[in-house]
Amino acid sequence: FFSEELMESDERLKFISNFSGSAGWGVITASHKLKSAIISDGRYQEQLKKEVSQKEFVILDGGLNKIIEFLNLYKQIKIIGVDTKLITINQFKFLESELKIKNIKFMLSTKNLVDEIWNNKPTIPQQKIVDVDTKYVGENFVSKIKRLSKIILNHSSEALITFKPDAISWLLNIRGNQLKYTPVVRCFALIHKSKKIHLFFEHDLPQLSKLDHGEIIFTNMNKFQSILKMFAGESFLVDYNSTPLFVLSALKKNKIKYKHISCPISSLKVIKNSVEQKNFKEVHKIDGLAFIKFWSWFEHLDKNNMFDEEYL
């Protein structure tokens, strides 16, 4: 879900390289004669040097564009495998356009090769969904869905697919518990103009919430293709910046038309109602108190001892 906080079962970059930062790209070469690459931004350059073997990896500072730079070092690389579940549509479009002149071919797959060698991979924990009472958010999910449905219709489409757990959690007034610090519900959604919603989850379905009824259906991710067959010939809205590449091939396979839209749920949720504004102020007070307690503790530390950011 392209989140900076991952479950242990998603930490493929850490497994293959020992890099434990929250953002990064990996390019793993097939030949032992060529170094692989680890790419992350300036926040993690010192951490990369500590955690990653520079005998095995080239460490690059930046983002997706550094993959191009790495491939310029090793011009003998002509075929690149891509996990279409771990790259967004626009990210792939960028790579494709930049590498076209280099005659590099892509091998697209929904299987991840790291998973193939990851013995004793951590299991995905059971997800429990908590419903957030309207008194805390100021608008029930039925009203929010109705507003979203109008946007879908105004774009001459039948449905929206979104891979943004924060947007889905806001829309349906729900929270999840799979991540330690980010209480979103990890799923993706197919939201139809008829107001019927399919929520797709990894492996075991979550413990039931009041949402799991006729109009909102909890479904396993492996049913995505079969669900799409129901909508053949329709037109979908897709956010190319947050939707993984495999979705496009699934839509094409089921003869569903699609077009790009910046996630309309994100646009809706950024405008806070009066209840949300009031509760934001209360949360800021709690947050401020926590900071004051921390600062008091910090001020009373024994200054004769050496402390660094890792200790703190």
Label every model-predicted segment:
Residues 98-123, 243-279:
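Terminal amphipathic helices with adjacent charged low-complexity linkers/tails
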Residues 49-51, 230-231, 257-263, 290-299:
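Short acidic (Asp/Glu) and glycine-rich catalytic loops that position anionic groups and cofactors
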